[in-house]
């Protein structure tokens, strides 16, 4: 991977126990299986470093 965060699991909303949070932050994450950046809505808690503010930022870091 170009950067370590790109190898982390595709970022999802919520905590590991499946509770989603109430924030609404349009975000991008690198999906290693699809080998592309994908959009998702981050709820504001949980997740990991595989979360970016734009498609361009995700692609610059991971592709």
Curated annotation (Swiss-Prot):
Keywords: Disulfide bond, Protease inhibitor, Serine protease inhibitor. The keyword Disulfide bond applies. Pfam families: Kunitz_BPTI. Disulfide bonds join 6-62, 21-45, 37-58. GO terms for molecular function: serine-type endopeptidase inhibitor activity. Residues 6-62 form the BPTI/Kunitz inhibitor domain. The record marks 22-23 as: Reactive bond for trypsin. Serine protease inhibitor. This peptide can inhibit, in-vivo, acrosin and, to a lower level, plasma kallikrein. It probably plays a role in Drosophila reproduction. This is Male accessory gland serine protease inhibitor. The lineage of its organism: Eukaryota, Metazoa, Ecdysozoa, Arthropoda, Hexapoda.
């Amino acid at each position: 991977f170009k950067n370590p965060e790109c190898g982390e699991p595709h970022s999802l909303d919520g905590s590991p126990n499946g509770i989603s949070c109430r924030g609404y932050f349009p975000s991008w994450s690198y999906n290693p299986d699809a080998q592309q950046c994908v959009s998702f809505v981050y709820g504001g808690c949980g997740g990991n470093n595989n979360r970016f503010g734009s498609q361009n930022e995700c692609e610059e870091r991971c592709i």
